[in-house]
C-alpha cells in the first residue's frame, strides 16, 4: 500500500505531491492524521476537518494566516 500526499492551496494551486508512507493500513494512516490535527500548538493554532472517501483521505486545514487542503491517495 502506498500513500501519496497532494497539498493544494485554497486557490487550487498544487503546492507539493509526495509519497509519504508505504505498507501502512488506511486506519493507521487516518489515525496518524487525526492525531496531528489534534496536536494543536498554541504558537501555530490550526483547525482540521478529516474524512475518508473513495480510497482517499482529505484534510482541510485552517491556520491563522492560510487555508489548505491535503488529499491523500491510497493505492494497494
Spell out what each predicted region is:
Residues 1-15:
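Short aromatic-glycine-(Arg/Gly/Cys) micro-motifs in beta-strand/loop hairpins
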Residues 2-4, 22-28:
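Compositionally biased, low-complexity segments enriched in small residues
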Residues 7-9, 18, 32, 48, ...:
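N-terminal compositionally biased, intrinsically disordered segments and leader/signal-like regions
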Residues 10-12, 26, 66-68:
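Generic "edge-of-domain/loop-turn" microfeature
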Residues 13-24:
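A short, exposed loop/beta-hairpin motif centered on an aromatic-Gly-Thr core
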Residues 25-44:
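A short, charged, amphipathic alpha-helix used as a generic interaction element across diverse proteins
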Residues 39-76:
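Short, mixed-charge low-complexity intrinsically disordered segments
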Amino acid at each position: 500500500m502506498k500513500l501519496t500526499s497532494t497539498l493544494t492551496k485554497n486557490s487550487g494551486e498544487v503546492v507539493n505531491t509526495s509519497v509519504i508512507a508505504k505498507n501502512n493500513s488506511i486506519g493507521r494512516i487516518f489515525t496518524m492524521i487525526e492525531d496531528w490535527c489534534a496536536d494543536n500548538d498554541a504558537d501555530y493554532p490550526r483547525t482540521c476537518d478529516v474524512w475518508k472517501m473513495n480510497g482517499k483521505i482529505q484534510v482541510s486545514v485552517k491556520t491563522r494566516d492560510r487555508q489548505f487542503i491535503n488529499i491523500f491517495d491510497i493505492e494497494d
